[in-house]
């Protein structure tokens, strides 16, 4: 029986082969302890929505590293398929060189552990997870296969997580962006925030 994946609990560890800088390397979740990690699953190589997501995260990779965050992509394809896709030009449907590892989950064990495996199709749904420096799952979202995710929203949530972890007496309200007002979760102290957003 698969354990229930819960925000606030340790993220399931894994060890797998990945493509890193066009070479085969072993990647472990525990390697990223001490940094934040954006871990995202996608259905298959050589498809349609998937390359748009992978390229977008790669092109904005520096924005994640500036936040002490690594990015890792995972699908049920083999590492050989990942490599072939990376070595295919973007104009031909490939992804070209990317700035983070692509992990092979050929046995589908990682997808199962993160509860994103679509059993009938045998592929992963578009799950995205943000794991903190202690290896604790802080955020989880899963899309159906036909629509992609937002790099902007991932960065927004990541910044909110970092903020509340460095300011544990504060919480971030709806649509919070870096630099916006936060609130203190206390009936009296929260009034300071609500007074600033109240309708005239």
Curated annotation (Swiss-Prot):
It is found in: Cytoplasm. Pfam families: 1-cysPrx_C (PF10417), AhpC-TSA (PF00578). SUPFAM superfamilies: Thioredoxin-like. GO terms for biological process: cell redox homeostasis; cellular response to oxidative stress. GO terms for cellular component: cytoplasm. It catalyses: a hydroperoxide + [thioredoxin]-dithiol = an alcohol + [thioredoxin]-disulfide + H2O. It comes from the Bacteria. PROSITE patterns: THIOREDOXIN_2. The active site is at 50 (cysteine sulfenic acid (-soh) intermediate). Its main location: cytoplasm. InterPro entries: AhpC/TSA (IPR000866), Peroxiredoxin (IPR050217), Peroxiredoxin_AhpC-typ (IPR024706), Peroxiredoxin_C (IPR019479), Thioredoxin-like_sf (IPR036249), Thioredoxin_domain (IPR013766). Keywords: Antioxidant, Cytoplasm, Disulfide bond, Oxidoreductase, Peroxidase, Redox-active center. One of its GO terms (molecular function) is thioredoxin peroxidase activity. Residues 5-163 form the Thioredoxin domain. Belongs to the peroxiredoxin family. AhpC/Prx1 subfamily. The active site is a conserved redox-active cysteine residue, the peroxidatic cysteine (C(P)), which makes the nucleophilic attack on the peroxide substrate. The peroxide oxidizes the C(P)-SH to cysteine sulfenic acid (C(P)-SOH), which then reacts with another cysteine residue, the resolving cysteine (C(R)), to form a disulfide bridge. The disulfide is subsequently reduced by an appropriate electron donor to complete the catalytic cycle. In this typical 2-Cys peroxiredoxin, C(R) is provided by the other dimeric subunit to form an intersubunit disulfide. Thiol-specific peroxidase that catalyzes the reduction of hydrogen peroxide and organic hydroperoxides to water and alcohols, respectively. Plays a role in cell protection against oxidative stress by detoxifying peroxides. Homodimer; disulfide-linked, upon oxidation. This is Putative peroxiredoxin sll0755. It comes from Synechocystis sp. (strain ATCC 27184 / PCC 6803 / Kazusa).
């Amino acid at each position: 029986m698969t354990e229930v994946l819960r925000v606030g609990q340790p993220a399931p560890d894994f060890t797998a082969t990945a493509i890193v800088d066009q070479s085969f390397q072993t990647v472990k979740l525990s390697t990223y302890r001490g940094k934040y990690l954006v871990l995202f699953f996608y259905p298959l190589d050589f498809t349609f929505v998937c390359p748009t997501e992978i390229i977008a995260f790669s092109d904005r990779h520096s924005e994640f590293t500036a936040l002490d965050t690594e990015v890792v992509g995972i699908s049920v394809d083999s590492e050989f398929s990942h490599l072939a896709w990376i070595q295919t030009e973007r104009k031909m449907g490939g992804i070209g060189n990317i700035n983070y590892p692509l992990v092979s989950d050929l046995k589908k064990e990682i997808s199962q552990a993160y509860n994103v495996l679509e059993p009938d199709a045998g592929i992963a749904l578009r799950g995205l997870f943000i794991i903190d420096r202690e290896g604790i799952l802080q955020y989880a979202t899963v899309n159906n296969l036909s629509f992609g995710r937002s790099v902007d929203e991932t960065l927004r949530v990541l910044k909110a997580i970092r903020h509340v972890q460095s300011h544990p007496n504060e919480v971030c309200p709806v649509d919070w962006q870096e630099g916006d007002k936060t609130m203190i979760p206390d009936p009296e102290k929260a009034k300071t925030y609500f007074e600033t957003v109240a309708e005239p």
